[in-house]
Design a protein with these regions (language model features):
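N-terminal localization/anchoring segments of enzymes in phospholipid and broader phosphate metabolism
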Residues: 1-348, 352, 356, 396, ...
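Glycine- and other small-residue-rich loops at beta-strand/loop junctions that grip anionic moieties
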Residues: 179, 367, 401
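Thr-Gly-centered strand-to-loop micro-motif
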Residues: 364-365, 422, 441-442
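Helical hairpin unit composed of two closely spaced alpha helices linked by a short loop
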Residues: 367-389, 393, 398
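Short glycine/threonine-rich loop-to-helix capping motif typified by GTGT followed
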Residues: 376, 402-406
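Flexible, glycine/threonine-enriched loop-and-boundary segments that flank and lead into catalytic domains
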Residues: 416-421
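Catalytic-core elements of nucleic-acid end-processing and repair enzymes
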Residues: 430
Length: 509
């Protein structure tokens, strides 16, 4: 009679996530012990390690890299002169592992022609919009498109029924790429349709981040999906080893259906994103549905990632859109950013919007952990008279990161930026909207990991009707928020010191 509870108990404590965490913790403890044992009493080794730390600091000073990241490491090395240099050699390289980098670059280079510039698609844009579009097209490279209908969703539960309808209509293929997939109501509804469509002969594929989904899926998930003819790739699989490679996660949220419809935004495939489960109060998110020519960018983004790990297609033409909406509602430019190169595409898009804004910039972000360049851009826009408003969570999912986000409030408020905290719960949306003609909806947080370490995606909207829909959503959300005042930001001396340390080390958190 006690057998079932015992089995459940051991299945919980012996699952893959728990085993991985325990093994990594043991490795960290062993490495610390080994370091202590080898350095104790060995003056020559201590001197060598200190010299290594000095060399690393000099290297960082000269390196062309994000200044906040460099300062974070220099501070850490200064605090831990014996260990700091060795830690940087082990964990300081931002680039993904060589194998991952080589695979993905090879595929992307082979399909550069699929994303060739299309000047006729941007002839209706003004000069400022064309400059931004040209940048993304050149350094992405992801072209902008007319003939694309868009629909903005102000929350996950508004998006979910429409997504199910589109999945039901699939005839040729369904591609999904997500950071988090978790068993529950949302995934069960999607999985049932995917299995049925796969049985009908529809090409169904799923890329999910192995770290993001580690706690949410059974260990035999891939086997079960493949048996149902749903092909799966766990991105950058988690192994129980201390490794920087685990930093580089696939944080994208993409659905592509028959090449004609695509979704992106902040919504993952888990119950909290549609408020079927309450974790941190009400979960406020955002997503966008695209139909038409611009879907092609997301199709290529997905296929490039897929073929890097399971080579299959050499010709992407069969996956091109077959239906274009009549007329054109502005211009849409989907894009992705990755740590494969040194081009900070996602950050530059945000910086450009702030630099070019004339009247307002409204921003949704769950986290605020930025470098001096982004901080200065926010302050400078406000000082120019632009109405800059930041909306952040009122109930955090990570308390330390929440404190870090709040540590930026004082300089921003003094510059004239208005800051709001969403009191009903956790705000997870990642959006920019400016001057009624420019917006971004995507997966890109305003933190170091999203801007420099993760694989991310977004959709730029130029003079599209859904720019106004996003603006109206922000304005409807503000009355549910608490506006932060300078008087709210008083803190004790220990608190101020903690905030300063968090700011310095924010790129490493």
């Amino acid at each position: 009679m006690f057998r079932l509870p015992i089995v459940k108990f051991f299945s919980r404590i012996l699952n893959r996530a728990t085993i991985t965490i325990v093994l990594v913790a043991l490795q960290v403890l062993w490495l610390l012990w080994a370091f202590w044992a080898f350095t104790t009493g060995r003056v020559w080794l201590n001197g060598l390690l200190k010299a290594l730390s000095i060399v690393i600091v000099l290297y960082l000073v000269r390196k062309d890299e994000n200044s906040a990241y460099k300062i974070g490491w220099i501070v850490l090395i200064g605090l831990l002169p014996l260990l700091g240099g060795a830690l940087y050699l082990a964990f300081g390289n931002k680039a993904p592992a060589k194998g991952l980098r080589t695979r993905m670059r090879k595929v992307e280079q082979a399909h550069t022609a699929d994303l060739a510039p299309r000047p006729d698609q941007t002839d209706t844009l003004d000069r400022v919009e064309k400059n931004l579009s040209h940048y993304v097209e050149t350094y992405g490279p992801y072209p902008a498109w007319k003939h694309t209908a868009a629909h903005y969703f102000p929350c996950g539960e508004a998006m979910y029924p429409r997504l199910l309808e589109d999945l039901e209509r699939a005839e040729k293929f369904i591609f999904l790429e997500f950071f988090i997939v978790k068993s529950g109501t949302m995934w069960d509804g999607i999985e049932a349709i995917l299995k049925r469509k796969a049985a009908e002969g529809v090409d169904v594929r799923l890329i999910y981040d192995d770290f993001g989904s580690l706690l949410g899926l059974p260990s035999d998930f891939v086997i079960r999906m493949e048996r149902s003819h749903i092909r799966c790739i766990p991105f950058n699989p988690v192994v129980p080893l201390v490794s920087l490679v685990m930093n580089h996660r696939d944080h994208r949220k993409i659905v592509v259906i028959d090449g004609n419809v695509a979704y992106t935004g902040g919504v993952n495939l888990a119950d909290e994103y549609i408020n079927a489960e309450q974790r941190f109060g009400y979960w406020k998110d955002a997503a966008i549905r695209l139909e038409g020519a611009a879907v092609w960018n997301f199709t290529v983004i997905f296929l490039n990632c897929w073929n890097a790990f399971r080579p299959q297609e050499t010709d992407y033409a069969p996956y091109a859109p077959t239906h274009l909406p009549e007329g054109s509602d502005g211009v849409v430019q989907p894009y992705t950013d990755s740590p494969l190169d040194e081009e900070p595409l996602a950050e530059t898009v945000y910086l450009n919007i702030l630099a070019q804004a004339q009247r307002y910039v409204y921003i949704y972000t769950p986290y605020l952990a930025v470098g001096e360049e982004m901080l200065d851009a926010l302050k400078t826009a406000a000082k120019r008279g632009v109405d800059v408003r930041l909306v952040l969570p009122g109930i955090p999912d990570k308390k330390l990161v929440f404190r870090l986000s709040r540590s930026y409030y004082v300089p921003l408020l003094r510059a004239g930026v208005r800051i709001y905290e969403y009191t009903p719960g956790f705000l997870h949306a990642k959006c920019y909207v400016s001057d009624d003609h420019l917006a971004v909806v995507g997966s890109i947080n305003m933190d170091y990991r999203s801007l420099f370490l993760h694989f991310e995606c977004g959709a730029l909207l130029y003079s599209n009707s859904q720019v106004i829909a996003l603006r109206e959503d922000v304005l409807a959300t503000l009355p549910q928020c608490r506006e932060v005042q300078l008087s709210d930001c008083r803190t004790s001396l220990p608190g101020t010191l903690l905030d300063s340390v968090l700011r310095l080390l924010s790129p490493l958190l």
